[in-house]
Swiss-Prot record:
SMART domains: LRR_SD22. It is found in: Cytoplasm, Cytoskeleton, Microtubule organizing center, Centrosome, Centriole. LRR repeats lie at residues 39-60, 61-82, 83-104, 105-126, 131-152. InterPro entries: Leu-rich_rpt, LRR_dom_sf. Residues 170-212 form the LRRCT domain. Residues 312-324 have a biased composition (Basic and acidic residues). One of its GO terms (cellular component) is cytoplasm. This is Leucine-rich repeat and coiled-coil domain-containing protein 1. Keywords: Cell cycle, Cell division, Coiled coil, Cytoplasm, Cytoskeleton, Leucine-rich repeat, Mitosis, Repeat.
Length: 1026
């Protein structure tokens, strides 16, 4: 056996110029033991005892190097391999990454299952010069995020990084949030730990390297078993010719090999076709390999012809009795001779088919099928040429036989030779029939493979559609959540605006009450003035009638002054009580501050974040469950493959069972077609579901539009009521202006009457007393004026504070409007339905802004009213000053008026009559104004009650609509979850069916291979006996 292995190594060294070399599990201790050619493109040294990378400096064109499962502790000796694309150093003893500076074209690097804790060797690979895209570092000892990011930041083309796989990772993977940190600092990454940026698992199916397997069956038929170029069962390489017969072990020794060795060979062959060896650059190389294979086939045919001519013994060159050259037996013999090409082993081929089933891609399958179709006619031409050459050779042999028959005279052995020839003819006919059945079976297997690929395509399309539906559902939910947040914000703003409206109305009512109190005070002052005037008239009448009654009149005046003092004190007390009440009301009022607003916002945000986190956790749990199910399926598939490999040698059936298995496979095909129909119906149901969801969403949008229209209608009614209130306020102001004018006219007339009456006063003493009383009253009035000024200042301060508060609120509202505008700009990129909603929201915002402007105008009007009241107070002060001056003038003119008294007595009676008439008219107007004022107040109260009722009804409607929307959303979510569960069940059923089909095809293939082996063994034994 050792000699066989050595010969295989030498033969592989000799044939390394073809491009690929495989020395898997050969027990090599160093690469220097091999003689490698500089034109090699790929080397596979998996599962050896190599401890150092050396003796590959001269291989300039090397592109794929596999040194996995060795004892390498240091990366070195790769400085000259500038064309290297893939490097596999997994399952070694490496502790540090280094020596990769010269690998400019390196795209894939596998360093898994090592002892690496230092990645500083990746620093020289930074920049646009290097093309490293894939790094596998799982099952190592990397424990620093900073070091990892520092070494990988400059890898501009890095798209796939694996730090954890199948539960085996690095210490860095235990750090919380390491995935988010790596994705933020490495934006070029697309896949991290076999998951994309969104955390979804990615199936890492890569291109398989078995482009040349379609020619293996043809090589088995072309190379015969008795040629000196057979290949042993332990051979794995496909492109290497077999050693001579004297070097190979016997068939009995091969039969005696245990099952464990076969399993080991299978397991060792499976990783030889790892996906890391394949790139799209190998397509051209594979075509070159096909051409080389064609040349080798021609050489093999010529060698087999020469070997047949050389190996024909002289004893066999005897004529047949009653045989013809054109008979069926000779024709079958010639066909058999033309097909004598070195036989290939089936164990590695089976292993490669398993690997291709696991890692087969659609594009690759199409490419292989195209190659198969393009290469078949060329190989048929080769087959025809070889058959013609062999026929010519056989004719030469027959001529030699006839020449030898004349010389040879030994007829005793003719009967034995004839029997042997007949047996050979029968065996060749059986072989020809078996080959025809084998061709049919191979065609049928190709059809089954095509159907399986089509089913895989349908399955992948179903998965893609489900993923798209999930993405669409997630986007719709996200949009709904954003719209609900906007609606909540607008509702909060509406509530705030209503609260501000109520506050402004309360302030307006307070100002109106204050004005009423001032009017009442003025009325009381006027009454007092009327009483004073009546007392003065009485005094004048008493002076005219009786001069002696002056003392009594003085006493009466004193009593009246005492009453006035008491009234003034009462007024002071009332004013003080009202001031206290006003202050208490101001203190008890609750203003909506910025801190409270921010607290409410933070609470709402916390609630929404919690909801979002809960939803994310639920989706993550679902993803984990699906990943576990997928891993379980993979494990089951692997277990099934191992079981099938163990049963590989136990199956020994004949050609009769093939027909029954074909019938079963036909039934399975019919069953698969039914399943395909079911999957198509499933896809149709999913499309119907999507359409129903779209209709439901349109209905929801319509309901939202109706709600917005109702809001606009209510806002319009409120604006109409506010305009009516404005008109009434304007009418009240006009009436007040008329009232002030009438009061000014009455004051002028009363001053005239007061001057005329004072002329009657003759007595100086009485005037002195009156002056003293007037001075006292003047002091009291000045005190009252000072108190009124203080009140005015306090009102001004309160007004300023109210204006500041209003300005702050206006600024807050402006900031809110700016944020809303920004939200509008971000939402303009969405669908048409969302645009309609945004337009409605903009209309609502405009209405709110108009309301705010109206409120600001109302506040301005209130401020103007306060300014008017202040002006009125100033006018009253000026009038008081003018009256004081008039008093002084009256005192001076008193002496002159006494003389003119008798002449003006008649005028006084006429004036008194006119004054009475004016007073009656004024009182009538005042009554009418009061009645109108009461009516307006009642109307305002009714309007406020109606507004409150409308607000309550609108809120109820909004709550009912929101509850109905939430119930519909929950129903839709439940229905979607049910449909998704049904789809997953159907997908699982389809996968189980595909597994069954794969198992059946593998069993059929194994049966055929066993039968072909039995035929080959039988033919080889017959040849040995001959």
């Amino acid at each position: 056996m050792e000699a066989a292995v050595c010969s295989e190594i030498e033969r592989e060294d000799g044939d390394s110029s073809c491009g690929d070399v495989c020395f898997m599990d050969k027990g090599l201790h160093s690469i220097s033991e091999l003689s490698l050619d500089s034109s090699i493109h790929a080397i596979n040294l998996h599962c050896n005892n190599i401890s150092k990378i050396s003796s590959i400096d001269h291989i300039w064109n090397l592109r794929h190097l596999d040194l996995s499962s060795n004892q390498i502790s240091q990366i070195e000796g790769l400085n000259t391999l500038t064309k290297l694309c893939t490097l596999n150093l997994s399952c070694n003893l490496i502790t540090r990454v280094e020596g990769l500076e010269a690998l400019v074209n390196l795209t894939k690097l596998n360093l898994s299952y090592n002892h690496i804790n230092d990645l500083s060797g990746l620093m020289p690979l930074h920049g646009l010069k290097y093309k490293l895209r894939y790094i596998d570092l799982h099952s190592n000892y990397i424990d620093s995020i900073h070091h990892l990011l520092q070494c990988t930041v400059g890898l501009h083309f890095l798209t796939n990084l694996i730090l954890e796989k199948d539960g085996e990772g690095n210490p860095i993977c235990l750090i919380p949030g390491y995935r988010a940190i790596i994705l933020q600092t490495l934006p070029q990454l697309r896949i991290l730990d076999c998951k994309n940026i969104f955390g979804e698992p990615v199936s890492l199916e890569e291109i398989n390297s078995s482009h040349l397997q379609c020619l293996e069956g043809l090589l088995d038929n072309l190379v015969s078993s008795d040629s000196p170029l057979n290949i042993s069962e332990d051979e794995v390489n496909d492109d290497v010719p077999a050693p001579p017969m004297d070097v190979l072990p016997s068939l009995k020794e091969f039969k005696s090999t245990p099952e464990d060795n076969v399993l080991a060979s299978l397991l060792s062959v499976c990783p030889s076709s790892e996906p890391e060896k394949i790139n799209q650059e190998n397509d051209f190389q594979n075509e070159v390999k096909l051409q080389k294979l064609d040349d080798q086939i021609l050489q093999l045919l010529n060698e087999t012809n020469n070997s047949l001519i050389d190996n024909v013994p002289e004893k066999d060159l005897r004529p047949k009795r009653d045989t013809d050259i054109t008979s069926e037996s000779d024709y079958g013999n010639r066909r058999e001779c033309s097909r004598k090409v070195p036989r290939r082993t089936k164990i590695p081929y089976y292993a490669r088919t398993i690997q291709t089933i696991k890692h087969h891609n659609k594009n690759n399958g199409a490419f292989v099928s195209c190659n198969r179709k393009m290469r078949q006619p060329y190989l048929r031409d080769l087959y025809v040429r070889s058959s013609l050459v062999n026929c010519n050779n056989l004719r030469d042999l027959d001529e030699q036989k006839t020449g030898v028959i004349k010389v040879d005279k030994n007829f005793s052995d003719n009967s034995t030779y004839r029997s042997l020839v007949e047996q050979l003819d029968q065996e060749r006919e059986m072989r020809w029939k078996a080959e025809q059945t084998e061709k049919k079976l191979m065609d049928y297997i190709d059809e089954l493979h095509k159907q399986a690929d089509e089913k895989k395509d349908v399955h992948s399309q179903a998965l893609i559609t489900t993923d798209r539906l999930k993405d669409a559902i997630f986007k719709e939910r996200h949009c709904k959540a954003q719209l609900e947040i906007i609606v909540h914000r607008l509702q909060n703003e509406v509530k705030k605006l209503t609260i501000e409206l109520m506050k402004a109305r309360d302030q307006q009512e307070d100002h109106i009450r204050h004005l009423r109190t001032l009017e009442r005070a003025l009325e009381k002052m006027e009454k007092q003035k009327a009483q004073q005037q009546a007392a003065q008239i009485r005094l004048i009448q008493e002076v005219e009638l009786k001069a002696s009654a002056a003392d009594r009149e003085i006493n009466l005046l004193r009593t009246s002054l005492h009453q006035e003092k008491q009234q003034v004190q009462q007024l002071h007390e009332l004013l003080a009580l009202k001031e206290q009440e006003h202050r208490q009301e101001i203190e008890t009022r609750q203003f909506f501050t910025d801190a409270e607003f921010q607290d409410a916002l933070t609470k709402r945000l916390c609630k929404e974040e919690r909801k979002h986190e809960q939803e994310v956790k639920e989706y993550q749990e679902k993803i984990d469950i699906l990943n576990q199910q997928y891993l379980d399926l993979e494990n089951e598939f692997r277990i099934a493959l191992t079981v099938e490999a163990r049963r590989f040698k136990d199956v020994q059936d004949g050609f009769e069972d093939v027909a029954t298995e074909l019938a079963k496979s036909k039934h399975a095909l019919i069953w698969a077609q039914r399943k395909e129909n079911e999957s198509s119906s499933l896809i149709k149901d999913l499309t119907c579901m999507v359409k129903e969801q779209k209709t439901k969403l349109s209905e929801v949008c319509k309901l939202k539009q109706e709600a917005a229209a109702n809001l606009q209608n209510q806002i319009n009614t409120l604006e109409i009521l506010i305009e009516d209130d404005k008109q009434k306020s304007i009418q009240i102001e006009l009436l007040k202006h008329e009232k002030t004018q009438l009061i000014s006219e009455l004051a002028a007339k009363e001053s005239l009457i007061y001057g005329l009456r004072t002329e009657r006063k003759v007595w100086g003493q009485e005037l002195a007393c009156q002056s003293s009383t007037l001075s006292q009253s003047r002091g009291k009035l000045e005190a009252q004026i000072e108190s009124l000024c203080r009140e005015n200042e306090s009102l001004r301060k309160s007004h300023e504070s109210d204006c500041d508060a209003l300005r702050i609120k206006c600024k807050i509202i402006e900031d809110q409007n700016e944020t809303i505008r920004k939200l509008k700009d971000s939402l303009q990129e969405k669908d048409g339905q969302i645009k309609l909603l945004q337009e409605q929201i903009a209309l609502i915002e405009k209405c709110s802004q108009e309301q705010l402007n109206e409120k600001s105008s109302q506040l301005d009007s209130i401020v103007e009213k306060l300014e008017r009241h202040n002006e009125r107070k100033e006018k009253l002060k000026q009038q008081l000053k003018a009256k004081e001056l008039e008093l002084e003038e009256i005192r001076k003119a008193y002496s002159t008026l006494n003389k003119k008294w008798h002449d003006k007595g008649e005028l006084l009676s006429h004036l008194e009559m006119q004054v009475k008439e004016v007073k009656e008219k004024f009182e009538d107007k005042e009554r009418k104004l009061k009645a109108e004022r009461d009516k307006s107040l009642e109307l305002q109260k009714d309007a406020m009650e109606k507004l409150q009722n409308m607000d309550d009804a609108f809120r109820r409607q909004v709550d009912e609509i929101v509850e109905a929307h939430q119930a519909e959303i929950m129903q839709l979510a439940n229905e979607k979850q049910k449909y998704i569960d049904c789809a997953n069940l159907k997908v699982q059923q389809v996968e189980d069916e595909m597994r069954g089909l794969l198992d059946e095809t593998c069993k059929n293939k194994k049966m055929m291979e066993e039968k072909i082996k039995q035929l080959a063994c039988a033919i080889s034994e017959i040849q040995k006996e001959m």
